[in-house]
């Protein structure tokens, strides 16, 4: 079955966090400029969306936002049209979207957390507005099966396919913004409310390349997997 084309929509990139767990790097640069294999996170993200035809972005930023703008302008915005929504104080994911909503004229738009690197196909989210991408739950701990106090099986850092976690990429409608707080996160306010109203859908990506960069260990693991999965070929080859 042919996959739907990406419509002419904008993508919000939520880049306002302080990245405290990535210190001391983020004492000097904002989290979106933290390099993964010598390429800043935000460059991976913009190039990722451009692979699917999205060339208009709203970057929601706060901490060291001028560095982000200067960096991208030096790269001629990677051939994209970029607008900036600046937060004077940290607004959370919901507040950031609400604050930047003035830049949106279209009925629907994409949102991506500012620490995600992935190859999942965002076009699949367009089948229904207010859809979130989900990937299999991962754990950083070993899991043990036990029968009568004997270990029968040991799983080192497994993927738990029966459970799914938020991948930090959404396709949202204008109407959902009425449920967003002026300050706060959509993950613990807007999404739970919309879920109870039956207004939130999920699209499963069981085999997607996906990393969330929250720690120095995440940088190391993502860097290795970019090489192992030839992710740079996916991003840079036409």
Label every PLM stretch briefly:
Residues 110, 117, 123, 150-238:
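Catalytic-core segments of class I nucleotidyltransferases/pyrophosphorylases
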Residues 62, 85-87, 133, 203-206:
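Conserved beta-strand termini and adjacent loop/short-helix elements that scaffold enzyme active sites
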Residues 69-148:
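Conserved beta-loop-beta/alpha segment of the NTase-like Rossmann-fold superfamily
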Residues 2-68:
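N-terminal glycine-rich phosphate-binding loop and ensuing alpha1 helix
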Residues 21, 67-70, 99, 179, ...:
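Phosphate- and divalent-cation-binding pockets in alpha/beta enzyme and binding domains
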Residues 10, 55-57, 81, 108, ...:
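Residues at the starts of beta-strands that form the adenosine-phosphate
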């Amino acid at each position: 079955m042919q996959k739907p084309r990406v419509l002419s929509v904008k993508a919000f990139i939520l880049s306002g966090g302080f990245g405290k767990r990535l210190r001391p790097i983020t004492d000097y640069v904002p989290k979106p400029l933290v390099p993964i294999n010598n390429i800043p996170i935000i460059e991976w993200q913009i190039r990722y969306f451009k692979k699917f035809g999205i060339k208009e972005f709203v970057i929601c930023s706060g901490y060291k936002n001028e560095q982000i703008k200067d960096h991208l302008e030096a790269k001629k915005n990677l051939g994209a049209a970029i607008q900036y929504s600046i937060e004077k104080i940290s607004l959370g994911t919901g507040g950031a979207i609400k604050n930047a909503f003035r830049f949106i004229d279209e009925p629907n738009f994409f949102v991506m957390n500012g620490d995600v690197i992935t190859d999942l196909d965002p076009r699949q989210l367009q089948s229904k507005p207010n859809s979130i991408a989900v990937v299999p739950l991962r754990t950083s701990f070993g899991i043990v099966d036990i029968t009568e106090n004997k270990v029968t099986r040991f799983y080192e850092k497994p993927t738990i396919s029966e459970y799914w976690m938020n991948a930090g990429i959404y396709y949202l409608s204008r109407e959902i913004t009425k449920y967003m707080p002026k300050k706060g996160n959509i993950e613990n306010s807007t999404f739970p409310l919309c879920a109870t109203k039956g207004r939130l859908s999920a699209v499963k990506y069981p085999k997607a390349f996906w990393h969330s960069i929250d720690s120095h260990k995440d940088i190391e693991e993502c860097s290795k997997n970019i090489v192992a999965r030839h992710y740079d070929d996916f991003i840079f080859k036409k």
